[in-house]
A protein has these predicted regions:
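Glycine-rich FAD pyrophosphate-binding loop
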Residues: 21-43
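N-terminal Rossmann-like FAD-binding beta1-loop-alpha1 element of flavoenzymes
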Residues: 2-29
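Short, glycine/charged-enriched secondary-structure capping and boundary segments
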Residues: 20, 42-45, 62, 103-105, ...
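Helical element adjacent to the flavin cofactor pocket in flavoenzyme catalytic cores
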Residues: 138-157
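Aromatic/hydrophobic pocket-lining residues that form π-stacking "cages" and hydrophobic walls in ligand
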Residues: 16, 71, 103, 154-155
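Short beta-to-alpha linker loops that shape the active-site pocket of alpha/beta-hydrolase fold enzymes
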Residues: 33-35, 123, 155
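Dinucleotide-binding Rossmann-like beta1-alpha1 core, especially the glycine-rich loop
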Residues: 46-126, 135
Length: 157
């Protein structure tokens, strides 16, 4: 007899199982594949988003920045690969540059640390392989990448 049955052991199922394992519960995880992370999780981009996209005031906006912080700690606790590499959103014309300003304002309201707009020269100093027609970039230094398979395995174990 189990207290909780979790169907699927991708990143959501494994995370749920890991969290529930911290309580006095008997947890059963059912997975149709022969290993964890064989569904949608295996095809994800492994990006831990900074939090400038969600519209301010939404649940996603409220949780995104805090979730990013917690993911770094979780990966450290479980010895899972985590690397803060930052991210760019590129603008190729003035209209797109205005959108970067909207994302910057949104990100600041959401509490994203270190977010800023770079001109083309500053962006190329950081990433010399950018296209020649880039006019600006939104830089989010808190964006990161993880090992999603390693995370699922560590949480499932």
């Amino acid at each position: 007899m189990y207290d909780v049955t979790i169907v699927g052991c991708g990143v959501v199922g494994a995370s749920l199982a890991y969290t529930l394992s911290q309580y006095r519960l008997r947890v059963l995880v059912l997975e149709r594949e022969n290993d964890v992370a064989m569904g949608t999780t295996k095809a994800n981009s492994a990006i831990v988003h900074a939090g400038y996209d969600p519209e301010n005031g939404t649940l996603m906006a409220k949780l995104n920045v805090r979730g990013s912080e917690l993911m770094e700690q979780l990966c450290s606790d479980l010895s899972v690969g985590y690397k803060r590499i930052g991210s760019f959103v590129l603008a190729f014309d003035e209209e797109q540059k205005k959108h970067l300003e909207h994302l910057l304002e949104n990100g600041v309201r959401n509490g994203v640390p270190g977010l800023r707009i770079l001109d083309a020269e500053e962006a190329r100093e950081m990433e010399p392989n950018l296209a020649e027609n880039v006019v600006a970039a939104l830089y989010a230094p808190s964006a990161a990448i993880i090992d999603p398979w390693g995370l699922c395995i560590a949480e499932a174990e």
